Amino acid sequence: KDLLYVGAEPPKPDSSALLVLKDSPWRTLADLKGRRIAVQKGSSAHYLLVKAVERAGLQWADIQPVYLAPADARAAFERKSVDAWAIWDPFYAATELAIQPRVLATGRDLASSNNSFYLAARPFVQAHPQVLRVLFDELSRADRLAQEARKDAIKLIADFSGLDAGVVSLFIQRRPSSPVDVPGPTTVADQQRVADAFFKLGLIPKPVNVADIVWRPAARS
């Protein structure tokens, strides 16, 4: 309880997907039964995979999750060591442009929000709430500038990250306007569903009440 959820961006459901190779025989979510599926353990893509399994009418035990970081997962995916891959941008965009995989489902298809959060230590939050407000205002301002000047934003991000400009352009296309604010009730409820699912899978040792670890700042004057 030393960490608090202090900020969140709007959902990005189009920025994550469950992929199979374009020549894969697997066509539906139900085809995942018994398959080896790469995913980063505990990530937003892990929850996407949980939702995919549920949508297919399967149990978690019906699949074989293979826990890999994105770079290792892509290598395994391309050499067919795994049958499918649950992943998010920009790795999703990079793979899409490089090898044209088939998308079995996106976060939008599966009602998986793919939220992004900002966390801070409770003592810092209590001592410096105004710093967080300034930070969120500046992040939101930067996002507005990126939305208004996409070509410039793409070049800056590509130069900084080393990603191909085409990859950056694709993932920015899928990224909605993303001002940062304190997590609201809908976002907290979304994250509670993730926490409950991860507890059920044994990824976290005990139940978590997300609302108890969300920053509740005083209203701005």
Report the location of each language-model feature.
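Phosphate-coordinating loops and pocket residues in cytosolic domains that bind phosphorylated ligands
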Residues: G34, L97, W215
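Secondary-structure end/capping motifs
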Residues: Q126-P205
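Conserved C-terminal helix/tail region of periplasmic/extracytoplasmic solute-binding proteins
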Residues: D196-S221
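Short, glycine-/small- and polar/acidic-enriched structural segments
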Residues: K1-Q59, Q64-Y67, D83-D89, L104, ...
